[in-house]
Amino acid sequence: MNNVLILCHRRGWNKLTNFILGLKKLDYRVTVVSDEYLTGDFNQFGLDKADEVCINENFNVEEILLHTPTADIIYSISENLLPVQSQLEKHYGLNNVSEYAAEILSHKDKFDTYCRDIGLGKYVPDSIVPITPSDLNMFNDRAFVIKPTIGNGTKRYGTYSNLEYYGFNNKADFLKYLKLNNLDSFFDDNVEGFIKPNFNNVKYRLIAQEFLDGTKGSHAPYTYIDHDSEVNLLWWFKMEMIKSKDHTERFEEQVYKVSSIEGDIEEELTNNILYFLTTLAKELQLKNIFTSGPEFFSNLKMFDINPRPGNGMNICDAVNDNKIWPQILSEAKADIQNHYVWQQVQLKPGKVKEVGDTSYLTQYADGQRTRPKIEPGSTIPEFSFIVDPDFCFPIITSGKNRVELGETVIRQLQDSISYY
């Protein structure tokens, strides 16, 4: 296996950082197909290390085949590109992801239904694509979240962007929000579906999914499913969420801390997560594919399997002298010597009057994000989320005292700021 083809949207370039480097260390020839070319980000995310980078706005299979007539393995960095991968694999004589598997893995509603059909229903949150208000009766006055059936929690788009990845306390609050915001055509529009240009123009609808409270923390694995459809556990990580409310009907919950876990997690949770993944891999006959999840909660329900490399894999590689990716790719394991904490900085909100020296932050900054300016006159929001285009401020700490170090860095920054 010498020729690697990577399918990646421009917005997913951050997941290529160190991944391409790891492949090159093993002497693979790497071709990246992306939908956009931005010179300023090219070197930052490691694309300069690829042998070729081809721009194909619509990921047209015929055009990709003309340029790249052969490949030994394909990695999709976004699940909505799995259908493209499955079509290419037929031409290349590969069988890692079938067209059927790609369809299941790239649509949340189809994934939930499939899991129920193969006996994994107890792990799947209640969900439905609502086309009438009565469809929401299934939640019995419980909270639920509205999501596109494709994509992830950082990409909102279109008429209903103010619904996507937001939670509602119950059906009544959701209907009230629709009325207050002149979104009465929601159910009719959801029958027809929507198109996202930046998701390869795949038609999707909006799904209502049982709200799983992540403020108490959830656990997930990074895994590599090998050529025998065996699930190889790489390491566990914990996710912690923060919940905000912008008014009485709608709330938002987003990740603010992700920590790699040293050792194992609770046995029952381990057994259930690995059973879920093993069953799925065997039933769909998945091969040579990464997963960044699924994320499991204390009630043993899950969401978002994320069948692709995750950002934490690049972070782990970076804080371990770029030794992790080559090990994963060659041995399907990860010998982690240096664990990490990634967290969104949460600061006291308000208008900044003065700020001291912050140059020390450079060594902790997530280099894949543009650090917001904290300067006299700038405003610090009440909550800092990764989806916030104006104030996304994550830091990375690693080593034995990584937790305490992160707390110290944030406290030092907070103490250096005065407010009006």
Question: Can you describe what each PLM-predicted range is?
Answer:
Residues 1-101, 404, 408-419:
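ATP-binding N-terminal substructure of ATP-dependent carboxylate-amine bond-forming enzymes
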Residues 175-245, 268, 295, 299-301:
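Phosphate-binding site of ATP-dependent enzymes
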Residues 50-53, 61, 67, 71, ...:
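N-terminal beta-alpha lobe that positions the nucleotide/phosphoryl donor
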Residues 213-279, 306-335:
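ATP-dependent carboxylate/phosphate-activation module, predominantly the ATP-grasp catalytic core
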Residues 327-420:
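Peripheral (often C-terminal) accessory segments that flank ATP-dependent C-N-forming ligase machineries
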Residues 277-314, 340, 344-352:
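Conserved metal-phosphate-binding beta-hairpin within the catalytic cores
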Residues 151, 200-202, 212-217, 285-288, ...:
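A short catalytic or substrate-binding loop motif that flags glycine-/basic-rich loops and adjacent residues
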Residues 144-190, 218-220, 241-265, 313:
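Glycine-rich phosphate-binding loop of ATP-grasp-fold ATP-dependent ligases
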